[in-house]
């Protein structure tokens, strides 16, 4: 046995024998490889596990700051507008130009622009007598709240004003188009109610009443505008795509239009002489972005106060219409439509299969004809080879052939 395997491993504790030296070299190499992996050293550097798991990915994102909210341009504009309002308010009581006063343009035979300005400016009421003579001691209207509200006759007719705690963007310009003469005239009530406007410096300015103006009953907005601005940091009602406010305690656009219409109608009916309408300062009917700063008020042919029309610019979204339609359908009708669709699909599939089969048949015919042509060529070539062989055998003993063989033999040598 030892003669068959003369090569012994010299490693301690290993007495294996091998037939040749190559096997022994491979075995020793295995010993060297195992000896290199000794016990783990305690002073070696511990490598941290950096496997990219989802938890570590989210942690890295939080450390870098990817989950932080980006600074919005609207918030920057809001802060800038609030700083400007604070600077203007701290400048002095006399340096007040009502930064967000809207202009009302009443279109009649000739367009007239009425710009409401502070009481100390001479252009505030160009056609009004002194304010103290026209002031009536009936129920005054204090313009303080930032949004319009509906009031009944005999109560406060209009609430519009400026609130320094809720600064707004540059106010929209309202364009009021006078209604055609075929519409009804709004009469004034028995008792005229004066309007008092609170300015930003704390002064109260009584506004004179004006002649009755025909007001429209439908307000068509050129663009969807939310009644309450959604400012970051200030809670507000969520607004969906069509511009309507969520029904959690907030009015829908139709209710807001009815409110605004009723307020304007009551205000105009309470005005019976003077320079026209009274406009609040910053928070007017609708607070909008600068690019949404025009509200066009038009009168339809036959308006209905209880059912305000919706302009084409505000399409009502039909959510879930397809689902409701499928629910309302009869099951037999649904099954019939399903079978019709199946029949149409089956006919299309049969047509495709027929075209495929016809193309395969054409290809098979072409290949068959080509095969027949090739077989004919092979037969002709075989016949020609046979004829040539016969000629060669016939001229086997010819002197010319013998001479050729001799010359070929000499050339071969």
Curated annotation (Swiss-Prot):
GO terms for biological process: heart development; hematopoietic progenitor cell differentiation; hepatocyte apoptotic process; in utero embryonic development; liver development; p38MAPK cascade. Residues 334-354 are annotated as: Basic motif. Keywords: Activator, Chromosome, DNA-binding, Isopeptide bond, Metal-binding, Nucleus, Phosphoprotein, Telomere, Transcription, Transcription regulation, Ubl conjugation, Zinc, Zinc-finger. A zinc finger (C2H2-type) spans 7-31. Residues 81-140, 299-337 are annotated as: Disordered. Residues 332-395 form the bZIP domain. Belongs to the bZIP family. This is Cyclic AMP-dependent transcription factor ATF-7.
């Amino acid at each position: 046995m030892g003669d068959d395997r003369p090569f012994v491993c010299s490693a301690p504790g290993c007495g294996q024998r091998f037939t040749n030296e190559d096997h022994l070299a491979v075995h020793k190499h295995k010993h060297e490889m195992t000896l290199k992996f000794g016990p783990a050293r305690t002073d070696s550097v511990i490598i941290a596990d950096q496997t990219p798991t989802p938890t570590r990915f989210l942690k890295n994102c939080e450390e870098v700051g990817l989950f932080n909210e980006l600074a919005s341009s609207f918030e920057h504009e809001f802060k800038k507008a609030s700083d400007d309002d604070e600077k203007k308010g701290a400048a002095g009581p006399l340096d007040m130009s009502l930064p967000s006063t809207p202009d009302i343009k009443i279109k009649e035979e000739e367009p007239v622009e009425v710009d409401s300005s502070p009481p100390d400016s001479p252009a505030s009421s160009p056609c009004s007598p002194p304010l103290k003579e026209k002031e009536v001691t009936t129920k005054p209207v204090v313009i303080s709240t930032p949004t319009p509200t509906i009031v009944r006759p005999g109560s406060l007719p209009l609430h519009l004003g400026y609130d320094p705690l809720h600064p707004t963007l540059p106010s929209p310009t309202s364009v009021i188009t006078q209604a055609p003469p075929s519409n009804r005239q709004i009469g004034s009530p028995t008792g005229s109610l004066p309007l008092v406007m609170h300015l930003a410096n704390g002064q109260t300015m009584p506004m004179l009443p004006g002649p009755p103006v025909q007001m429209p009953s439908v307000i068509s907005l050129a663009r969807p505008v939310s009644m309450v601005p959604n400012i970051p940091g200030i809670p507000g009602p969520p607004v969906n795509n069509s511009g309507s406010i969520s029904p959690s305690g907030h009015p829908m656009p139709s209710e807001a239009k009815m409110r605004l219409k009723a307020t304007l109608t009551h205000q105009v009916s309470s005005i019976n002489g003077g320079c026209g309408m009274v406009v609040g300062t910053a928070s007017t009917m609708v607070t909008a972005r600068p690019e949404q700063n025009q509200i066009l008020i038009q009168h339809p042919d036959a308006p209905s106060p209880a059912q305000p029309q919706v302009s084409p610019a505000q399409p009502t979204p039909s959510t879930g219409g397809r689902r409701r339609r499928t629910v309302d359908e009869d099951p037999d009708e649904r099954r019939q439509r399903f079978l019709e669709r199946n029949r149409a699909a089956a006919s299309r599939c049969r047509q495709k299969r027929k075209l495929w089969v016809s193309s395969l048949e054409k290809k098979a015919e072409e290949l068959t004809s080509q095969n027949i042509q090739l077989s004919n060529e092979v037969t002709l070539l075989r016949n020609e080879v046979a004829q040539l062989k016969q000629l060669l055998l016939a001229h086997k003993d010819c002197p010319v052939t013998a001479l050729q063989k001799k010359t070929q033999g000499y050339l071969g040598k």
